[in-house]
Every structure is written in structure tokens, then in C-alpha cells.
Amino acid sequence: MTEPLKPRIDFDGPLEVDQNPKFRAQQTFDENQAQNFAPATLDEAPEEEGQVEAVMDAALRPKRSLWRKMVMGGLALFGASVVGQGVQWTMNAWQTQDWVALGGCAAGALIIGAGVGSVVTEWQCLWCLRQRAHERDEARDLLHSHGTGKGRAFCEKLAQQAGIDQSHPALQRWYASIHETQNDREVVSLYAHLVQPVLDAQARREISRSAAESTLMIAVSPLALVDMAFIAWRNLRLINRIATLYGIELGYYSRLRLFKLVLLNIAFAGASELVREVGMDWMSQDLAARLSTRAAQGIGAGLLTARLGIKAMELCRPLPWIDDDKPRLGDFRRQLIGQVKETLQKGKTPSEK
């Protein structure tokens, strides 16, 4: 049997022409680019190295310069002249039995002695800062070394400088994990993963506490002068505590150089209302809409304090960052936003009642 023919179907529109998909031009990579390829992270952009970091490096890691040598030489000549003149005055006063002048010479000698002692103490502090930079370079070399015998002594010296007792659980775990067949790289890596996080955790807590206090203080303070003074005090105190935590004592000269950084931080805090403009990248739209102007400025000051603490932590730390263990600004950012949100909710609850 023959099947009946199907009726004809007429289409109103024109036939669709097959379009060839358009591809981008081929892009080739050489072997060097392929080996150094790193995927971009969308969660957090890397911290921009700006003026704050440069000043921080100059403050905690002082460098020698020609002008500094000239000033030190002039001060040395002036000090020698003062001492020589003082000796001559003392001899003349003793020969002429001028007891008043002799008492003045004795008082001047005490003042000069105190000044020399302060200079020596300051020099020791600067020397400790330079030694910490050398220790960090030495640790970086040991982390790439396959030799033996230097890693254990180096780590024990770091533990002694940090004030970690031999009976500390973290140090005991490190002693139990190392043996004679391990090279310096493995010994230092174990120290960085078992002992160093104890100090890093304390530094993180100090940074979180200072950043939170700066955020909440500026969020509730109505006076800009109080905000500036509070930020200056908290930033200097944070740097001193982090340096002391890692076994570094800052002298007067280092604090004067750090004061320049604090002034920059205060200037940034005065312009922290820019946080409201870019707040959509940092927090959800709902929370940004509920934040007041003072709260946004407080978050900006808190983030800058946290950034200052991270840089101080990096420069005072005896070991370089390994395995991406460097604290990120985003971690402190989330804590600050959560604390501000909790504070705002607590402020609304009593008013609603």
C-alpha cells in the first residue's frame, strides 16, 4: 500500500541563514609566561603599596644616608668641643676655688652623661631594628637551603628573643617534630607552622582590638579633634605593642619617624568619608544603606589602623610570610562591619522598647 502524501507547509518568514560563530584571535604564551601563570582572585584585590607602606618601611627599617652621616659627624664634633670646654672650665674652677662654677660643671657633666646614655640606648634600638631585617633575610635563605646545622640554632634564638619559654607547648611540639635527618628548610618551616603562629595570633588580636576601638570611637564621637587625638594615640600604642610582642624595642628616634606615619593616617581618617562611595564593594547594599556617616568614617579609620598594624607586623616579624599566611585586610574588614552592625542593632533595640 502506498502512504498518502503529506500536505505542503508554507512558511511566511525567510529561511534563517546559519551564522558561523566568531572566535577571538589565537593568543600564544611562551614557556616563561606559562610557568609564572597565576589565576586572578576575585574575592580580594591585593593591597596597593602606597605612601603609607613607604613611610612605614622608613620608620621601622631605617636606612643610612649621607646627610645623616654629616649630621652625626657634626654632633660628634660638637659633643667633643663641649666636653673639652667643660674639662677646661672644671680645671680653672678648681684652681681658682670657684665652687659655684665647679658645681655648674658637675651639673653639666650629669646632663651630658644622661644625653650620652640616651644616644647609646637609641643606637641599640636602631641596631635591633637592623638586626631584625638581617634575621628576616637569613630566614629567607634558610627556607631555600638544603644544608643542616643552622636551622635549629636560628629558631631557638628567635624563640628566646620573643620570650617563649622552653616549656611552652608550641615549642615542645616543635622539638618533638624535628630530628637530625631534616635540613634547615624543614626545621625552619616547622617552626613557622608550629611556634610562630602563637605570636602572630597575639598580634592579630592586638590589631583587631585597636581597629575595633578606633571604629567605634569615631562612630560615636561628635568631635573631630578627639578623633584625631584618639587615632594618634591608638596607632602609636599599636605599633609599640606589636614591636614589643616580637622582641623589638622602639627608641625615641624611631617613634619620631613613626609620628610622620601617624599624621598620614590621621589625614586619611579625615578623608574616610570616601568609604561611603566605595562601600558597595566592601559590604552588602542593605548594610551600607543603614550605616550613618559617622559609622562609615569609623570603618574607614578602623581599616587604616588595621592596615598600619599589618605592615608593622610584617616588618617586626622575624620570618617572611610563607604559604599565604599573611593576614588580609578583608579579615579585619568583616570583623569591623560585624561589630558596627551589632552596635547599631543594640542602639536601635532600647529605642524601640
UniProtKB/Swiss-Prot annotation:
Cellular location(s): Cell inner membrane
Chief place of localization: membrane
Keywords: Cell inner membrane, Cell membrane, Membrane, Transmembrane, Transmembrane helix
Membrane-crossing segments per the record: 70-90, 100-120, 213-233
Pfam families on file: DUF697
Lineage top rank: taxon: Bacteria
Membrane topology: Multi-pass membrane protein
GO CC annotations, alphabetized: plasma membrane
Family: Belongs to the UPF0283 family.
NCBIfam families: hyp_HI0043
Name of the protein in its database record: UPF0283 membrane protein YcjF
Organism: Shigella sonnei (strain Ss046)
Gene name of this polypeptide: ycjF
